């Protein structure tokens, strides 16, 4: 791909498992450095290091994540890799999540009001919407990660536009948009983008291989579906707004095109 002035080092990836040896992402420093090089080559200048916080499986916390980021920053500098790191976590549902956020045990994205919120992958949780509303009521903006990849999205699809309308944000995975996760996640990512609102695209990278930190191709796909301006909002403008901790009402909202126009757009794109 030949990069223009707009694409060179202009993107922000707010969901990445790059920190070495802390979850199911990069297993070691060599892999983490390889991932960082891939991100830079793709045009990414800032990455949120977002390891899992999953009680009983990945017992990470804000203090440990910050220490890991500090160590990795030193490694990047020694390797001559220019990549800005900010803190975050891929936070799974937990009954005490609001309290953990308030106590600082769970980090938000770069210390903002926004944080990554991961629903269970295989089972629709009965109290998901209730917890999202509680988080919003306490001043947090949950960024719901990869809804397009959840096995239960078909039977609960309306839940996601409803939560987004209430104030939650939705983040799609770049690889789902480009088809790396198969036809089903690609279909749901297209449907969500068609009908809105989708706020962010991120890599959810876990390796330097199939799940690497690459989002440029997904941005190009989004540009064909939504237009250039909105595609850049997904990977640059709204991520920057999160880093700046802007109130959601100060951020350009994603377009709400509705079902009819969305399906018409998809029909026309196949011609």
Labelled PLM ranges:
Residues 40, 136, 193-194:
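Non-catalytic positions within long, well-ordered alpha-helices that form the structural scaffold/packing
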Residues 58-171, 253-271:
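Extended substrate/RNA-proximal surfaces in nucleic-acid metabolism proteins
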Residues 1-80:
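An N-terminally biased module of ancient metal coordination in phosphate/nucleic-acid-related enzymes
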Residues 197-213:
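Short acidic/histidine-rich active-site segments
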Residues 220-271:
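Mid-to-C-terminal alpha-helical segments outside catalytic/metal-binding sites
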Residues 17-19, 52-53, 88-92, 120-122, ...:
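Active-site beta-loop-alpha junctions enriched in small/polar residues
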Residues 9-13, 47, 114, 142, ...:
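Hydrophobic "anchor" residues on beta-strands that sit immediately upstream
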Residues 4-10, 48-50, 102-112, 167, ...:
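Active-site gating loops and adjacent loop-to-helix segments of metal-dependent hydrolytic enzymes
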């Amino acid at each position: 791909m030949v990069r223009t002035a707009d694409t060179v080092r202009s993107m922000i990836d707010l969901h990445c498992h790059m920190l070495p040896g802390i979850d199911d992402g990069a297993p070691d420093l060599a892999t983490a450095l390889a991932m960082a090089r891939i991100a830079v080559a793709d045009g990414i200048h800032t990455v949120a290091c977002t390891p899992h916080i999953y009680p009983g499986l990945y017992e990470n916390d804000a203090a440990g994540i910050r220490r890991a980021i500090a160590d990795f920053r030193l490694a990047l500098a020694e390797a001559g890799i220019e990549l800005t790191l900010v803190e975050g976590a891929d936070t799974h549902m937990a009954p005490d999540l609001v309290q953990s956020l308030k106590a600082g045990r769970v980090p938000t994205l770069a210390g903002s009001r926004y944080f990554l919120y991961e629903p269970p992958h295989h089972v629709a949780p009965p109290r998901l919407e209730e917890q999202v509303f509680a988080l919003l009521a306490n001043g947090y903006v949950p960024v719901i990660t990869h809804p397009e990849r959840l096995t239960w999205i078909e039977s609960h699809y309306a839940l996601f536009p409803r939560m987004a309308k209430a104030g939650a944000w939705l983040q799609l995975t770049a690889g789902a948009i480009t088809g790396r996760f198969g036809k089903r996640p690609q279909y749901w990512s297209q449907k969500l983008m068609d009908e809105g609102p989708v706020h962010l695209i991120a890599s959810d990278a876990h390796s330097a291989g199939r799940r690497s930190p690459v989002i440029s191709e997904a941005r190009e796909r989004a540009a064909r579906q939504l237009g250039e301006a909105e595609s850049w909002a997904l990977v640059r403008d709204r991520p920057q707004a999160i880093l700046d901790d802007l109130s959601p009402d100060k951020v350009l909202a994603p377009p709400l095109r509705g079902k009819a126009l969305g399906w018409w757009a998809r029909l026309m794109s196949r011609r």
